[in-house]
């Protein structure tokens, strides 16, 4: 540790960044070294350099704000007597033990046959008998009959459309004895048609399921007579019992810090306004491994606690060992603090919920003691790009039909989407911890899409899973552009394919087995559709290039002509269009019936629907190609990155669009040229597909523009109720996001090393509270020496994380950087300050400076 004399200019610069009075600053300016400075700050002149810099953490942190932190009882000491902030409640551990998966039904059967019992499962309760369970089963049998019946009729029509009618004219005895090529030529058209017919049946059944779901949702919302909706079980004004404590947990990972804490603050203030704040605690559960973002999170937590007086109510925890991703993050919370709460509400990084909505969820849980999870229907809002506004419009207009329809078919055996939902803690801890999937490869290891699995385990344990589809006050945001949405879809695709391994796990309810199946089909339908189109093109090439065989039997008197029934083709095409687009029309009819003012009026909402339909038709083939790639990547074991999606409005550059969509454009051109060469008249049928692929680059770029989205908003196109009459929670979120960006902390790790107060905050919030041990001391010295040697730009991520987590090493690095006047660190810090004039930790910034007004306010 250096004890070199302090340079006057560096000592003055150091003191200038502490909010001291003129008298205090003048008194400390007489120090001859930074070691002496920290000794005097700590009021301990006998302390060594290492002890002094650590002891000065408290004074550096509390200067000018000691009363605030002391009144909130936020200051404490660790086992070694070092100052720390009480950023989380005392840990009271609860046992969280995941049950190993037994996914191989053959192994289970073999063990039973050989007299070796399978491992016992944890005890589970039986969901009490209720009328809704019988009604739900009957409804689902009806849905299955409707889907299968509709698919059989459509398949019969499709069979009549295809030119080669069945295999009856193929002589199997003859093809065995004839040359292989002759067999291929004879069988090929029939094999193609059979494959096309099978694919058509699967895809049509998938479309049929969505149609009947939307139709029943339309009827539920139109009549308003759903006697099984869970929101009807509470009057909505019952007092919440003191023991019904609820933790609001927000798992985050390398997120947009200003937006995250703006939404958290808006939600906190709304809960406070509801009068039920004493029943809720808030937890930010960080898995961030970007040290700049981690430091920004620390500062944002301190700021939001100060602004809301939320000390002791808003907590922050950053994991050092990031296992099992988001599900592991929640497991860690449940293990440390879950036993102290009766309920848990999971928020996403972009979630905002009103206090009334959260209070209603707790009341519904209290009124339904057999409910394990109650999921709200989040409303998408808050984005301004043209793409995001069209998606917001689609989810806001069409989404309620599908959500109500899901509730109609599933009732208390429903979906959980991983956020904006309330969970009963005790059964969740006992039954919903997720073990890794056994085996090796892309579909083994930590479960990626945890939400569907947790819902299935909750129901298997004997607890209901409900959707409160009509509960207002639940909000989320959507990706701003197509490419960001596709990045998210890749993760979801891999996760849903992994989940299908649980399809045959013992004890799963049939509804949740179907949920696993629909999760797979959400993405597997893309390669199936692509294969259907490819085989259809191959059949066209077969009919065009291969000489047809009109006489396939000896002594055949009449030729066998390939058949074509255009009237059946038109009828089937029309039916498919109705199934795809009638739900959208029903959504608009429902808005007409309920009132269209909040959507811009009847004319504007209808025009918006037509434009959105055209846009969705343009994007469907593009998504098909990408999802096909994602499915192939998952099966081939290509890694799916888990980067957080873009949460802010962001346009797609032309260069990135060309890189991402260029292969699709070339595919569209080549496909169109091939079909035009084979049969130009068939190109009209394929034009919506190849045309969309050819236009994918400009559509992706243009739709990502914020200017076009705002222009559409000015014309009341794609208008949603949250834009017509913005709820207070969303207004507050926008305002706080704007303010947070104004004061956003950049280059956080350099600030945590160099800045006097930022270093104090980082040391006080560091979590590696080791005692004295020679190996630990040696490792600390090695890390500090490395940081001094290579500077901030040469420091690797693991060393950064280790330094940020260790209060002793971080404080020593801070002292050594200033004592040696290390230019590699201090120059970067100065540049950061010059580029970041609104940083909240600069005392030279006038405290009464006004906040910038919200743009557009």
UniProtKB/Swiss-Prot annotation:
<dbReference type="GO" id="GO:0009250">
    <property type="term" value="P:glucan biosynthetic process"/>
</dbReference>
<comment type="function">
    <text>Involved in the biosynthesis of osmoregulated periplasmic glucans (OPGs).</text>
</comment>
<comment type="pathway">
    <text>Glycan metabolism; osmoregulated periplasmic glucan (OPG) biosynthesis.</text>
</comment>
<dbReference type="Pfam" id="PF00535">
    <property type="entry name" value="Glycos_transf_2"/>
</dbReference>
<dbReference type="InterPro" id="IPR029044">
    <property type="entry name" value="Nucleotide-diphossugar_trans"/>
</dbReference>
<keyword id="KW-0472">Membrane</keyword>
<dbReference type="GO" id="GO:0005886">
    <property type="term" value="C:plasma membrane"/>
</dbReference>
<feature type="transmembrane region" description="Helical">
    <location>
        <begin position="606"/>
        <end position="626"/>
    </location>
</feature>
<protein>
    <recommendedName>
        <fullName>Glucans biosynthesis glucosyltransferase H</fullName>
        <ecNumber>2.4.1.-</ecNumber>
    </recommendedName>
</protein>
<keyword id="KW-0328">Glycosyltransferase</keyword>
<dbReference type="GO" id="GO:0016758">
    <property type="term" value="F:hexosyltransferase activity"/>
</dbReference>
<keyword id="KW-0808">Transferase</keyword>
<feature type="transmembrane region" description="Helical">
    <location>
        <begin position="515"/>
        <end position="535"/>
    </location>
</feature>
<dbReference type="InterPro" id="IPR001173">
    <property type="entry name" value="Glyco_trans_2-like"/>
</dbReference>
<keyword id="KW-1003">Cell membrane</keyword>
<feature type="transmembrane region" description="Helical">
    <location>
        <begin position="682"/>
        <end position="702"/>
    </location>
</feature>
<comment type="similarity">
    <text>Belongs to the glycosyltransferase 2 family. OpgH subfamily.</text>
</comment>
<feature type="transmembrane region" description="Helical">
    <location>
        <begin position="196"/>
        <end position="216"/>
    </location>
</feature>
<feature type="transmembrane region" description="Helical">
    <location>
        <begin position="142"/>
        <end position="162"/>
    </location>
</feature>
<keyword id="KW-0997">Cell inner membrane</keyword>
<keyword id="KW-0812">Transmembrane</keyword>
<keyword id="KW-1133">Transmembrane helix</keyword>
<feature type="transmembrane region" description="Helical">
    <location>
        <begin position="572"/>
        <end position="592"/>
    </location>
</feature>
<dbReference type="InterPro" id="IPR023725">
    <property type="entry name" value="Glucans_biosynth_gluTrFase_H"/>
</dbReference>
<dbReference type="InterPro" id="IPR050321">
    <property type="entry name" value="Glycosyltr_2/OpgH_subfam"/>
</dbReference>
């Amino acid at each position: 540790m250096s004890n070199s004399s302090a340079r006057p200019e560096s000592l003055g610069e150091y003191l200038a960044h502490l909010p001291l009075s003129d008298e205090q600053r003048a008194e400390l300016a007489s120090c001859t070294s930074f070691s002496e400075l920290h000794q005097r700050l700590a009021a301990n002149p006998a302390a060594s350099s290492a002890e002094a810099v650590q002891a000065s953490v408290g004074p550096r942190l509390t200067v000018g704000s000691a009363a605030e932190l002391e009144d909130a009882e936020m200051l404490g000491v660790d086992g070694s007597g070092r100052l720390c902030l009480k950023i989380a409640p005392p840990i009271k551990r609860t046992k969280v033990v995941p049950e190993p998966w037994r996914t191989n039904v053959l192994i289970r059967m073999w063990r039973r046959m050989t007299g070796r019992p399978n491992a016992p499962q944890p005890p589970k309760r039986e969901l009490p008998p209720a009328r809704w369970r019988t009604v739900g089963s009957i409804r689902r049998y009806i849905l299955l009959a409707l889907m299968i019946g509709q698919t059989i009729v459509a398949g019969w029509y499709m069979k009549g459309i295809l030119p080669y009618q069945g295999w009856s004219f193929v002589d199997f005895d003859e093809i065995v004895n004839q040359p292989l090529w002759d067999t291929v030529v004879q069988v090929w058209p029939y094999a193609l048609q059979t494959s096309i017919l099978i694919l058509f049946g699967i895809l049509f059944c998938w479309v049929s399921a969505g149609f009947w779901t939307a139709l029943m949702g339309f009827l539920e919302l139109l009549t308003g007579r759903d006697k099984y909706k869970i929101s009807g079980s509470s009057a909505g004004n019952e007092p919440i019992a003191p023991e019904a404590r609820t933790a609001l947990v927000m798992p985050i990972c390398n997120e947009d810090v200003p937006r995250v804490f703006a939404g958290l603050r808006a939600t906190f203030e709304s809960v406070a306004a509801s009068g039920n704040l004493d029943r809720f605690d808030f937890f930010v559960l960080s898995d961030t491994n970007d040290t700049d973002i981690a430091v920004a999170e620390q500062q944002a937590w301190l700021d939001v606690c100060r602004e809301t007086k939320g000390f002791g109510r808003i907590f922050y925890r950053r994991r050092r060992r990031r296992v099992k991703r988001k599900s592991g993050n929640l497991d860690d919370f449940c293990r440390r603090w879950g036993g102290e709460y009766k309920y848990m509400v999971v928020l996403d990084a972009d979630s905002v919920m009103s206090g009334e909505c959260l209070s209603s969820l707790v009341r519904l849980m209290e009124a339904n003691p057999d409910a394990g999870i109650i999921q709200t229907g989040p409303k998408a809002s808050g984005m301004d790009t043209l793409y995001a506004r069209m998606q917001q419009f689609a989810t806001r207009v069409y989404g309620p039909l599908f959500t109500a329809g899901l509730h109609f078919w599933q009732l208390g055996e429903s979906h959980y989407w991983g956020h904006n939902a309330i969970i009963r803690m005790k059964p969740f801890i006992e039954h919903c911890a997720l073990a890794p999937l056994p085996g090796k490869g892309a579909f083994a290891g930590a479960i990626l899409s945890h939400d569907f699995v947790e819902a299935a385990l909750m129901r298997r344990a004997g607890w209901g899973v409900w959707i409160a589809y009509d509960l207002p006050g639940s909000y989320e945001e959507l990706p701003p552009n197509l490419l960001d949405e596709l990045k998210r879809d890749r993760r979801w695709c891999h996760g849903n394919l992994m989940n299908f391994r649980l399809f045959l796990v013992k004890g799963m309810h049939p509804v949740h087995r179907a949920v696993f199946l629909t999760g797979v089909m959400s993405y597997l339908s893309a390669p199936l559709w692509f294969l259907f189109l490819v085989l259809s093109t191959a059949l066209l090439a077969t009919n065009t290039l291969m000489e047809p065989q009109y006489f396939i039997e000896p002594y055949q008197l009449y030729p066998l002509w390939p058949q074509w029934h255009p009237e059946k083709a038109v009828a089937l095409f029309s039916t498919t269009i109705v199934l795809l687009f009638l739900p959208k029309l029903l959504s608009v009819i429902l808005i007409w019936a309920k009132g269209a003012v909040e959507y811009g009026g009847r004319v504007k909402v209808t025009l918006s629907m037509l434009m959105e339909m055209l846009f969705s038709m343009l994007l469907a083939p593009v998504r098909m190609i990408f999802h096909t790639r994602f499915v192939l990547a998952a099966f081939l074991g290509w890694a799916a990155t888990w980067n957080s999606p873009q949460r802010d409005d962001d346009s797609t550059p032309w260069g990135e669009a060309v890189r991402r969509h260029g292969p699709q454009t070339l595919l569209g051109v080549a496909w169109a040229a091939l079909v035009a060469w084979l049969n130009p008249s068939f190109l009209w049928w394929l034009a919506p597909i190849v045309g969309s692929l050819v236009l994918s680059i400009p559509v992706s770029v243009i739709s990502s523009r914020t200017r076009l989205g705002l222009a559409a908003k000015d014309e009341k196109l794609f208008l949603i109720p949250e834009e017509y009459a913005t709820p207070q929670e969303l207004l507050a979120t926008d305002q706080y996001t704007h303010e947070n960006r104004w004061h956003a902390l950049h280059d956080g790790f350099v600030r945590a090393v160099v800045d006097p107060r930022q270093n104090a905050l980082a040391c006080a919030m560091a979590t590696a509270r080791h005692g004295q041990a020679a190996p630990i001391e040696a490792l600390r010295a090695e890390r500090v020496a490395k940081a001094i040697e290579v500077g901030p730009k040469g420091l690797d991520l693991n060393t950064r994380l280790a330094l940020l987590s260790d209060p002793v090493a971080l404080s020593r690095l801070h002292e050594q950087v200033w004592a040696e006047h290390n230019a590699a660190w201090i120059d970067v810090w100065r540049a950061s300050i010059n580029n970041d004039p609104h940083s909240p930790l600069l005392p030279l910034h006038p405290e009464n400076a006004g906040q910038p007004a919200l743009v557009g306010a």
